[in-house]
A protein has these predicted regions:
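A short acidic (Asp/Glu
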Residues: 101-108, 134-135, 190-192
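Helicase-core coupling region on the C-terminal RecA-like lobe
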Residues: 1-75, 132-134, 169-175, 179-203
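Short, glycine/acidic-rich beta->alpha junctions
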Residues: 118, 159-163
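A short beta-strand element within the Helicase C-terminal
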Residues: 124, 130-144, 148-154, 169, ...
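Short, contiguous acidic/charged loop-to-helix segments that flank catalytic cores in large enzymes
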Residues: 56-64, 85, 126-129, 153-160
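Conserved P-loop NTPase motor core of helicases/translocases
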Residues: 19-25, 111, 125-127
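Conserved nucleotide-binding/hydrolysis micro-motifs of P-loop NTPases
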Residues: 100-103, 129-130, 143-146, 184-188
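Conserved helicase motor "Helicase C" RecA-like lobe of SF1/SF2 P-loop NTPases
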Residues: 75-125
Length: 203
């Protein structure tokens, strides 16, 4: 729905496939665990990642975001196990981040919890994800500085108006669930991300 409104003037009507309308399958989950609860109950979620302290900032990398992504992956795996659901991480779960350095960092954090999954899961940039989909997509924006906002965008114009190709691809890779991570204050300086955050919070 968001992609249709933001990029196609509402002209792209969602089909509403059964797997997008049915209840999420996680009947059993730990309600005291915030990450597990988010995964078990939300189809679209924005997770605010606080800015790192100045001395902890690294170019094209975000340690805290990588750790939260690893916790999301852990929650997905645990929920499937708790609910007796089969799951193939390499085919059903995908992670999109904008930088190679962040790809390595995310993989390293996942490896601390699930070494086999860290080897198999596809963690890549939005450009390389074009044309493929997963049941669950985790999209980490990674950036910590205002000047990096432009890196996330690829604005073009078509008949329906201005389209951010990168954001459009990132948020339309998910069949069932989409988790977006980033620094809310920073991302809200971009009009489309501002609208996306509002959309996630309402749904």
């Amino acid at each position: 729905d968001f992609a249709s409104e933001a990029f196609y003037g509402g002209l792209l009507l969602p089909v509403g496939l059964p797997h997008q309308k049915e209840d999420l399958p996680y009947k059993t989950y730990d309600a005291d665990n915030l990450i597990e609860t988010l995964v078990a109950t939300k189809r679209c979620t924005f997770i605010n990642v606080p800015k790192p302290a100045l001395e902890d900032r690294m170019p094209k990398a975000n340690v805290l975001e990588a750790r939260i992504i690893a916790q999301l992956v852990h929650a997905v795996l645990i929920l499937h196990e708790k609910n007796g659901l089969s799951f193939n991480p390499s085919r059903q779960l995908g992670i999109i981040v904008p930088f190679r350095r962040q790809i390595a960092l995310v993989r390293a954090e996942i490896a601390k919890l699930h070494p086999d999954v860290a080897r198999d899961i596809v963690i890549d940039t939005v450009e390389r994800y074009q044309g493929s989909q997963r049941d669950i997509i985790i999209y980490g924006t990674t950036i910590t500085q205002g000047y990096e906002l432009d890196i996330l965008s690829n604005l073009t114009r078509d008949a329906s108006g201005e389209v951010d190709r990168k954001l459009n691809v990132a948020i339309t890779r998910a069949r069932k669930q989409l988790f977006i991570l980033g620094n809310e204050k920073l991302l809200r300086n971009n009009v489309l991300y501002d609208k996306l955050i509002d959309y996630c919070k309402k749904n």
